[in-house]
């Protein structure tokens, strides 16, 4: 298993569902700077992360809904990490 070791100013974790997503962004000190439930749309996501885009990495769990988010991050040049929950 490979672990992500990149260092960033902000870290975004997403609990992604079909219609909603819970977004939490931490700064490099581990303090929460954003915690919000959003509609699962590119527009809502990009608006929420806009203030933190300078140095942000996005991560979500490998579920059936992750493809669009990975594609959006690639298009927007946002580092993206796909996590696998241990069994």
PLM-predicted stretches and their roles:
Residues 1-87:
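Phosphate- and other anionic-substrate recognition elements at nucleic-acid/protein interfaces
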């Amino acid at each position: 298993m490979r672990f992500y070791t990149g260092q960033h100013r902000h870290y975004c974790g997403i609990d992604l569902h079909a219609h909603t997503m819970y977004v939490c962004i931490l700064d490099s000190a581990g303090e929460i700077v954003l915690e919000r439930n959003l509609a699962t749309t590119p527009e809502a996501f990009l608006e929420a992360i806009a203030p933190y885009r300078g140095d942000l990495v996005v991560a979500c769990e490998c579920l059936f809904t992750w493809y669009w988010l990975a594609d959006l991050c690639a298009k927007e040049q946002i580092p993206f990490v796909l996590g696998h929950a241990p069994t």
